[in-house]
Amino acid sequence: MNTSMSVPPLGYGFHLTNTPLPPLQEVLENLFTVEIPMTVTFRGVNSRQSALICGPHGCGEFAPFLEYGAQESAAWLACALEAAWLPTPKPVRTRIPLNATLPAVPAERVPEVLAKYEGEIQELKIKVAEKGQSLADDIARVAAARDALPNARLKVDANMGYTLAGALDALRKLCEYGIIYAEQPVASIEDMAALRFAIAKEGLPARIAADESIRKAEDPLKVARANAADLMVIKAAPLGGVRRALALVEQAQLPAVVSSALESSVGIATGASLAASLPTLRYGCGLGTVSLMAEDVTDEPLIARDGFMDLRAITPSPQRLERLATDEQTRQWWVERVTACYRVLERACGL
């Protein structure tokens, strides 16, 4: 266990490049608020609101979920400002391997959802442990996915939905369908470590990936110190930007896979920049979620084709921004939210 790891500060990208935060007024003058309808219910939402912020190096996306407070959401703002005001790090690769994402739909809807993805699906992340559903629902969904994709790599994401005993029972059954890893099956780091030990003892092939234990933790490196995961799932926005996420991966010394926070192509481009900058990338990234949206802010969405996404910049379309714009009351709510998060970020940067 490496006990010398230390968490980089919020606003790390600006610290690292010795760049001041852009003035708040400039940020607000270049802010566009949108609401994008979705084709399926995902994490209980049918549409996605966000604020796009444009600067000298492009646009960033500020899209913390509506229930998040300023303290948690400030990392998302740091990411958006870094994307808009700082150059992207030099990439290691220009094509990103992706997984498709299957929401917790009934088994009979699996072929319909998978048909929305272009080309061959080589890796699929399946949502399980949804509130109000049963393990039988999870098994049926995974079985339907395996029937539809006999050669694809499958992985499941429980979003902390199982108990320790329930997770072990679920993995015994789900491993029959050849899943390669389970993402955040339980809530606590202690239970993650116990589950990892238990499945190794039973010889189950699935690995354990940490998501919420990293992106929602005050100390995102605690899971690595506790040897509670085989790999880490990282998201640029909740971790405060590409540079801070890369620093966390370097310190944790765990394989990493990048996932989206359900953003438009603007936010996905930031996630792709993070994936492109990782020293190694063993698994497909969860950046194919634009396919779950009925619209996008650009004429050329960042979507997967045959399991890969090309690294490229995204320019929002003025016509789409106008069509997807929120009403003025909602826009003002986002302005106030950005302002509150900016104050948190300002303090973190010592300004």
Model-derived features with residue positions:
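Short, charged beta->alpha transition segments
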Residues: 84-87, 100-116, 131-132, 139-144
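Active-site mouth loops of central-metabolism enzymes
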Residues: 36-44, 95-110, 128, 158-164, ...
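Short beta-strand elements
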Residues: 49-54
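Flexible C-terminal active-site loop/helix
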Residues: 2-32, 36-48, 59-64, 83-86, ...
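Mid-domain alpha/beta scaffold segments of enzyme catalytic cores
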Residues: 60, 65-109
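Catalytic core of soluble alpha/beta enzymes
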Residues: 131-270, 275, 295-297, 302
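Glycine-rich, proline-tolerant flexible connector loops at the mouths of alpha/beta enzymes
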Residues: 61-71, 122-139
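Hydrophobic faces of well-ordered beta-strands that scaffold small-molecule active sites
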Residues: 34, 60-62, 94-102, 122-126, ...
